[in-house]
Structures are given as C-alpha cells and as structure tokens.
Curated annotation (Swiss-Prot):
Chain's role: A translational regulator that binds mRNA to regulate translation initiation and/or mRNA stability. Usually binds in the 5'-UTR at or near the Shine-Dalgarno sequence preventing ribosome-binding, thus repressing translation. Its main target seems to be the major flagellin gene, while its function is anatagonized by FliW.
InterPro entries: CsrA, CsrA_sf
Oligomeric form and interacting partners: Homodimer; the beta-strands of each monomer intercalate to form a hydrophobic core, while the alpha-helices form wings that extend away from the core.
Name the record gives this protein: Translational regulator CsrA
Any single Pfam family the record assigns to this protein: CsrA
Superkingdom of the source species: Bacteria
Species this chain originates from: Fervidobacterium nodosum (strain ATCC 35602 / DSM 5306 / Rt17-B1)
Homology family: Belongs to the CsrA/RsmA family.
Main location: cytoplasm
Amino acid sequence: MLVLSRKIGESIIIGDNIEVKVLKIESGTVKIGIIAPTNVKIYRQEIYQTVAEQNKKTISEIVNSPDDLKHLKEVLKNVNKNR
C-alpha cells in the first residue's frame, strides 16, 4: 500500500486521468474530490461491499442447478449486448 500525506488543496494523480484532491479536513473527517472519466466507476467501499453481498445472496437464491447458472449466464450476455 502506498501511503501519501497531503494538505488541503493538494492532489494525487492516479494513472493519466484520475485526480484525487483533499478538499477539507474537519473533526477527524477528510473530504475528498475525485476527477475521473465518466466510464470509471467510483464507489464508497461500504456501499460496494453491501451491493456485492446482496448480489451474491440474490444469485444463490436464483441458482439451484448448473442449468440455472447456464441460463443466467445467457440472460446476462444478452443484457450486455443490448447496452
């Protein structure tokens, strides 16, 4: 893990097109701003983890056999084609 120190108004650059800037530090909370292309998905870790857990639970409720899994794979493939 890379650990960096930044002051208010200072940034770090990730890759060629993502900037993370420290906007405010108050009461033990750091407010950051992120500038990134619209195709880069950005989530708070706790939200990402909750959604992933819900997705796993939903799939386990839907998939009862290998045939169910094959069908789900085909459905998802078709959904992605139509995007």
